[in-house]
Every structure is written in C-alpha cells, then in structure tokens.
C-alpha cells in the first residue's frame, strides 16, 4: 500500500530594502551554494596536495595455511614499509601552488557571481520601484478622470457639452483604469522576477521598501572622474583578477611540463619478520630473522617519443593564449567602464530634462483641468493635454530609474557597496 503525503510549504512575508534583497540572495542562492561547495572541494585538494611532501607508511600482515603428510601447519609474516619522493622535477611544489591558485581563483569567481547577481537584483528592484511610482501617478490621474467624467455627465444633462465630449471623457476614464490594472499586473510580475533572483518561494509575500529618490543630484555630485573610475575598476574587477590567475596557472603548467625532463628520486624503507608457526604435531617455533631494507631509486627520462617536448610546447601556447586573454580583458574592462561612465552622464542629463518637463506639464495639466471646469477649453484640448502629461510622466520615471540603475552599476564595477 502506497501512502502519498502532501507537504505544504509555509509561506512567509518579507519587507525588504535593496540591501536586504542582496543579503537574502547571497544566503539562499542555490547556484552560489554550489560554487561554495566547489570551493570546499578545491580546498580539500589543496590541503591533500601539501601532504605529498611527506612519506607514506603502510603495514602488511600475512598468514598461510598448508596441509602435508604431517597434517596442517601455519606460518605468517608481518612488515612495515615507507616511501617518500625526494625530487620529482619540482612537480610536487608546482602541484601545490597550482591547487592554491585554483582555490583563490574560485573565490574571485564567486565575487564575479555576486556582482552579476547584484546587477540583476538591482535592475529588478528598480523596475518594481519605477512601476510603483508610476502606479501612484496613474491613480491620481484616474481620480482626476473620474471627477472629469462626473462633471461631464452633469454638464451633459444640462446641455453644456455634446454627447461626443461625454463619450471622450468616458473613454479616457476607462483607458486610465486599464492603465492602473496593467501597471498592477506588471508590479506583480516584477516581484515574481525578483523572487526568482532571491531564490524565494514564489508564493511568499514580498514588499519592497522605497528609498528617497526625490533628489538624485547627489548621484552626479559623487561621480568620480572618468580616469578615476577606470583606475578603481582595473583594481577591483573580478574578470581581470581571474585572467591574472589564468596566466599564473598557465605558468605552473609550463613548469610542470618541463619538470618531466628531470629525473625523479625516491627513497623507501621496509622492515619485516616471520611469525609463530605451528606444525601438524602441535609444535611451534619462530622462524626467520627480521629483515630490514633501505633503498634509493632514481628514474631518469631518456626518450618519451617526443611526448614531453610536445607537452611543454602546448603548455607554452596555452600561456600565450592566457596572456592574450588578459590583454583582451583589460581592453574590455576599460571599454565597459568608459561606456558605463558616459551612460551615467547621459542619463543624468536626460533625467534633468525630463524632470523639468514633468514639472511643467503637471502644472499645465492642472491649469487645463481648471479651465475645463469653467468651460474655457474643449474636452479634446483637455484630454490632449492629459495624454501629453502622461507621456512626459512615463519618460520622467524611466529616465529617473535609468539614472539610478546606471550609476549603481558603475559603483559595482568600481567595487563599491551597493545601497539606495
């Protein structure tokens, strides 16, 4: 009989700032945990490789049974042996160093993953913020549209406006209502995307804490010069440090390949002796004397059918490739940072322009709304101004959060802590 048990996962509620999101993601990311396990494995390999400098030690025990014309007899032996590699072309030290570099490279790779994850979370978080701010404006516009429709219905009853004007007001109200619904759906989808990045249960409740974004002039004031930004990024960017580790690992591979040209020297020591034996008549005696041996052996490579030479050549080619990759990484980092820096400058200018336009169109829309109440402008003129205001508002919110995102991405490149 099979019993099926349904495990209901408990839902949680979270109220997170951007910093909270970053900390939660680092603690719960399955991919990051997998990379940490890889690091533990590399650390184990490194620690074990250091033990290769030490001699090994083994023991042996043997017991024999034989049957002859006198009956059964037994005999046995015990022994202890040890060996140690004295010299192997430097490959023991090279292997240790190679394993250490692999371990450190994995730590830098983990930093790069954290940066990539932080960038994705930042983008998703700001998308939620932008849509939430847009929703607040849309709700204000919807309330205005509702009042306009009520006034229009009253004025239509007394013949102050045409039916076509009333229909335009109704259409605008339902259009604004639909915008609110669409934005709310977008926010829910944005939050779901953010939960995925946080490795959070999709059914958990997540509320984000909105920072103060009314004045973003400080983002420009704290901006370093372009050369300073490049210099900071060149020191911090994990991509460059990983490329540097790749060069050092390739150099060790060359050393290890060249080590096969040299002889290897090892030493060994053994101690053995016989044990008590019984013959078929029940007599016992010790037999044999303890045997001791100490030896040193040397293996000298003479001819390997060109294998060692080929391995050295291929390792040097790999080193040259690693050096080329590093130079390419340097160029890519410089290009990326320069582009990111100029994107920030451009985004700030776009934000300031859209900020001025939003303020102007907001006041203009309010003025048009008052004029419409007194009947000095037509319905078409009012709705045209309202739609112009909505377009400018959308552009303002997009430029606002685009500036924040681009500025914070530049901070990530420069190795600065991310906060809003």
What residues fall within each predicted segment?
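Periplasmic alpha-helical coiled-coil/stalk elements that build and connect Gram-negative outer-membrane
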Residues: 116-232, 343, 347, 389
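Acidic, low-complexity, intrinsically disordered peripheral segments
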Residues: 8-11, 19, 202, 395-420
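Small/polar, glycine/serine/threonine/aspartate-rich low-complexity segments that form flexible
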Residues: 9-14, 60-88, 95-97, 211-222, ...
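Amphipathic alpha-helical coiled-coil segments
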Residues: 22, 34-49, 113, 117-137, ...
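Bacterial Sec-pathway N-terminal export signals of envelope proteins
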Residues: 7-58, 202, 208-248, 418
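A glycine-/polar-enriched beta->alpha junction
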Residues: 23-33, 40-55, 80-98, 108-115, ...
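Membrane-embedded beta-strand positions of outer-membrane beta-barrel proteins
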Residues: 35, 57-61, 99, 243, ...
């Amino acid at each position: 009989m099979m019993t099926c048990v349904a495990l209901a996962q408990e839902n949680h509620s979270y109220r997170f700032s951007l910093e909270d999101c970053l900390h939660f993601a680092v603690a719960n990311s399955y991919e990051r945990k997998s990379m940490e396990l890889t690091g533990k494995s590399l650390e184990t390999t490194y620690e074990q490789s250091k033990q290769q400098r030490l001699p090994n030690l083994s023991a042996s025990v043997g017991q024999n049974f034989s049957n002859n014309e006198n009956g059964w007899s037994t005999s046995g032996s015990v022994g202890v042996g040890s060996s140690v590699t004295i010299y192997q072309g430097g490959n023991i030290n090279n292997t240790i160093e190679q394993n250490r570099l692999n371990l450190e490279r994995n730590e830098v790779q983990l930093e790069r993953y954290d940066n990539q994850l932080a960038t994705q979370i930042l983008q998703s978080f700001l998308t939620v913020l932008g849509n939430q701010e847009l929703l607040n404006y849309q709700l204000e516009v919807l309330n205005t549209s509702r009042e306009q429709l009520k006034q229009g219905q009253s004025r239509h009853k007394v013949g102050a406006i045409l039916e076509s004007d009333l229909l335009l007001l109704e259409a605008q109200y339902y259009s604004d209502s639909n915008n609110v619904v669409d934005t709310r759906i977008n926010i829910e989808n944005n939050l779901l995307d953010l939960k995925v990045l946080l490795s959070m249960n999709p059914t958990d409740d997540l509320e984000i804490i909105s920072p103060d974004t009314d004045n973003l002039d400080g983002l420009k004031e704290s901006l370093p010069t372009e050369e300073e930004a490049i210099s900071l990024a060149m020191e911090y960017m994990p991509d460059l440090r990983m490329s540097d580790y790749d060069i050092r690992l390739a150099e060790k591979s060359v050393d290890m390949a060249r080590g096969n040209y040299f002889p290897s020297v090892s030493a060994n020591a053994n101690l053995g002796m016989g044990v008590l034996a019984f013959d078929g008549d029940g007599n016992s005696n010790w037999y044999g004397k303890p045997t001791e041996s100490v030896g040193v052996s040397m293996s000298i490579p003479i001819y390997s059918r060109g294998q060692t030479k080929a391995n050295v050549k291929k390792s040097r080619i790999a080193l040259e490739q690693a050096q080329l990759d590093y130079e390419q990484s340097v160029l890519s980092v410089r290009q990326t940072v320069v582009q990111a820096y100029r994107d920030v400058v451009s985004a700030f200018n776009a934000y300031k322009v859209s900020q001025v336009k939003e303020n102007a169109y907001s006041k203009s829309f309010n003025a048009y709304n008052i004029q419409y109440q007194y009947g000095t402008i037509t319905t078409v003129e009012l709705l045209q101004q309202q739609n112009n205001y909505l377009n400018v508002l959308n552009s303002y919110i997009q430029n606002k959060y685009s500036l924040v995102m681009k500025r914070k991405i530049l901070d990530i490149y420069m190795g600065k802590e991310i906060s809003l």
